[in-house]
Amino acid sequence: MAEGKVDPVHQFTIETLFGTDHWSIGGYNIAFTNSALWMAITTAVLIVFVAGGAKRELVPGRWQMAVEGLTGFVDNLLQANIGKAGRKYLPYVFSLFAFILFANMLGLLPLALVGVHPFTATSHFTVTGVLAIMSFAIVLGVGFAKHGLHFFSLFVPHGTPVPMIPIIFPIELISFMVRPFSLGLRLFVAMMAGHVLLEVLSGFVISGTNAGVGTFFLAAVPSFLLMIGICALELLVAGIQAYVFALLTCVYLNDAENLH
């Protein structure tokens, strides 16, 4: 990277922290990377968060209230979209929602000030894609386990004229099959775009500061102020994207449970 230049996509580079390129199983590299590290940190934070709020105190503290509030939020989401049958999916959807939320938030921490460079795992499609495939696999498993081959009736909307079935069925099937792709892509694009924008603005700040007083006030100061606003927006996006992912998972589970 040239001096004074900022590479907007360098922050997404997967770097090996432990192991070598020769560490592989079945042709897949298993070296410990920065992505794996921050996913492990996210998982640890999630476990500590839940464990700390699991204490059933008569007068709940703030930690317990936070855990119960987040759990209640996800539970209401399931009830609203699936009904009473949605309660059994609470552990999975809660874990999914909290993991994405914490991963998004940890990637926004200003740890570079102390020499630590946070990594947003959800800015990689391999991560968001796996999360989406997990949800899709559960949807398929529930659908076929509960309805058998009748699950295919999901792709023929009620009241469809018989002559239209050969046309409607493949369209509905294709739209169903692309769900995991769109689910993972949405989260990946949202997180990557925000981080790239922040990096570009930081480049303007650095360049404007090095260019002179006039450029500093014309480019660096406005870019810095815009960065503050974008950071606040990114915090909002981090929560919204976790919510959208959980919401769509609930909607897809409802299709498997109730065939609509």
Swiss-Prot record:
<dbReference type="InterPro" id="IPR035908">
    <property type="entry name" value="F0_ATP_A_sf"/>
</dbReference>
<feature type="transmembrane region" description="Helical">
    <location>
        <begin position="187"/>
        <end position="207"/>
    </location>
</feature>
<feature type="transmembrane region" description="Helical">
    <location>
        <begin position="213"/>
        <end position="233"/>
    </location>
</feature>
<keyword id="KW-0813">Transport</keyword>
<keyword id="KW-0997">Cell inner membrane</keyword>
<keyword id="KW-0472">Membrane</keyword>
<protein>
    <recommendedName>
        <fullName>ATP synthase subunit a</fullName>
    </recommendedName>
</protein>
<keyword id="KW-0406">Ion transport</keyword>
<comment type="function">
    <text>Key component of the proton channel; it plays a direct role in the translocation of protons across the membrane.</text>
</comment>
<keyword id="KW-0066">ATP synthesis</keyword>
<feature type="transmembrane region" description="Helical">
    <location>
        <begin position="234"/>
        <end position="254"/>
    </location>
</feature>
<comment type="subunit">
    <text>F-type ATPases have 2 components, CF(1) - the catalytic core - and CF(0) - the membrane proton channel. CF(1) has five subunits: alpha(3), beta(3), gamma(1), delta(1), epsilon(1). CF(0) has three main subunits: a(1), b(2) and c(9-12). The alpha and beta chains form an alternating ring which encloses part of the gamma chain. CF(1) is attached to CF(0) by a central stalk formed by the gamma and epsilon chains, while a peripheral stalk is formed by the delta and b chains.</text>
</comment>
<feature type="transmembrane region" description="Helical">
    <location>
        <begin position="30"/>
        <end position="50"/>
    </location>
</feature>
<dbReference type="Pfam" id="PF00119">
    <property type="entry name" value="ATP-synt_A"/>
</dbReference>
<keyword id="KW-0812">Transmembrane</keyword>
<keyword id="KW-0375">Hydrogen ion transport</keyword>
<keyword id="KW-1003">Cell membrane</keyword>
<feature type="transmembrane region" description="Helical">
    <location>
        <begin position="125"/>
        <end position="145"/>
    </location>
</feature>
<dbReference type="GO" id="GO:0046933">
    <property type="term" value="F:proton-transporting ATP synthase activity, rotational mechanism"/>
</dbReference>
<keyword id="KW-1133">Transmembrane helix</keyword>
<feature type="transmembrane region" description="Helical">
    <location>
        <begin position="96"/>
        <end position="116"/>
    </location>
</feature>
<feature type="transmembrane region" description="Helical">
    <location>
        <begin position="151"/>
        <end position="171"/>
    </location>
</feature>
<dbReference type="GO" id="GO:0045259">
    <property type="term" value="C:proton-transporting ATP synthase complex"/>
</dbReference>
<dbReference type="InterPro" id="IPR045083">
    <property type="entry name" value="ATP_synth_F0_asu_bact/mt"/>
</dbReference>
<keyword id="KW-0138">CF(0)</keyword>
<dbReference type="InterPro" id="IPR000568">
    <property type="entry name" value="ATP_synth_F0_asu"/>
</dbReference>
<comment type="similarity">
    <text>Belongs to the ATPase A chain family.</text>
</comment>
<dbReference type="GO" id="GO:0005886">
    <property type="term" value="C:plasma membrane"/>
</dbReference>
